[in-house]
């Protein structure tokens, strides 16, 4: 079994089960089923059973709830392939270690591409350079922890040790306005857990989450299904608490603008999730020198979002 928000993890699980001849059940919030119809169809075409979750906010949190209920009820016959760096131990560690291929490969490629001459850019003939900034979007946090892990212990070679490490930035879903309206009033139309959350327990881990004073989980909002989650992986909570990683947010409209700009300038159609990271990347770039390097994790393709984006654009 698996849970999924954006649907990509569900598709991967369905593909693996089809190859191995295993029964596959994927839990997905009913709202996400509607806005990710393409991935739902891909899963069912590979033989998976997609279960729309109708409880709660009908998004990723509720899909995780149902998957965990299934798993603990049928633990002797069921294996839960969790889709993010959330949940009880050892799930966050398992996901981090498997996703670390993202950061390890990116780090190796960065060092290779910045040694000598590549294309129209000539770098020093020495050993390659690490990026000045690493950026990724954060919902539950799987793609981000996979990217960040490879750089957590690095000090940039162009800096003195006292000046700090490679800068790492996670970008959450700011929803309609971010956690606050223009007049400073708080709003719940977002999923910026690390920006505006408090410490609590969700899905078996102690982390930052969006909850009321009575401890009830708040409903969240994001145009991107994969970031629409009221908690975050506990490793990100620790990285925020330690100050090693900065966490920012981008709103729905900023993500839509970034998606269109990347599509038209690069010929790459990014998913809505990494489009949040792209917005922040472009804002950071305005403050940097031309010779500095930003590494951004474009963790998903936008095909799955096109119907949803078309509706949002009117």
Task: Please provide the spans of the model-predicted regions.
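Active-site nucleophile and cofactor-binding loops and adjacent substrate-binding regions
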Residues: 1-9, 56, 99, 135-140, ...
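A short, small-residue-rich loop immediately preceding and capping a beta-strand
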Residues: 1-16, 20-29, 117, 124, ...
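Active-site/ligand-binding loops adjacent to catalytic centers
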Residues: 61-96, 113-119, 123, 127-128, ...
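Alpha-helix C-terminal capping segments
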Residues: 11-23, 148-156, 279-289
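Claisen-condensing/thiolase-fold acyl-transfer catalytic domains that form or cleave C-C bonds
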Residues: 138-142, 146, 252-313
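Short beta-strand segments
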Residues: 28, 54, 81-85, 136-139, ...
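Active-site-proximal loop->helix
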Residues: 9-66, 180-196, 305-312
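Phosphate/ATP-binding catalytic cores across multiple sugar-kinase/actin-like superfamilies
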Residues: 101-113, 283-284
